[in-house]
Amino acid sequence: PQAALRVCIETRACNERERFHVDHVALRLICTYRGQGTQWLPAHVIETSSGGGGSDAVPASMLQEIPGGAIAVMKGRRYPDQPDSGLVHRSPMAGVDSPRILAMVDIDFA
């Protein structure tokens, strides 16, 4: 199978927290170079909460974070042979005076 790649380096400055979601890609490699890392939830938390994303009503003790500088590989909705098994995650708040700097590589299979 062929793979399509999309490489992106961006800054994010938002005073509102993103909602939990799963990316519409097969795989995403992500690294936060500046600011707080991407927040994610273990699968067992999703199964007992509102059904796979979109809700922020989860116990703070269940929230996990990818450390800044770490490279993470996250499954998305289009991961082959395992649809809808992607990692539920969100970007944390980042103020205009302290934006996050992210590098992402999205991989999709044709």
Task: For each feature predicted by the language model, list its residue ranges.
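Signature of the catalytic double-stranded beta-helix
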Residues: 1-9
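A residue-level signal for beta-strand positions that form part of recognition/binding surfaces
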Residues: 6, 29, 100-102
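A short linear-motif detector with a strong N-terminal bias
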Residues: 8-12, 18-19, 50-53, 79-86
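Short, structured patches in soluble enzyme cores that scaffold and shape functional sites
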Residues: 9-13, 31-34, 42, 76-78, ...
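Catalytic core of non-heme Fe(II) oxygenases with the double-stranded beta-helix
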Residues: 14-70
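Catalytic core of Fe(II)/2-oxoglutarate
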Residues: 57-110
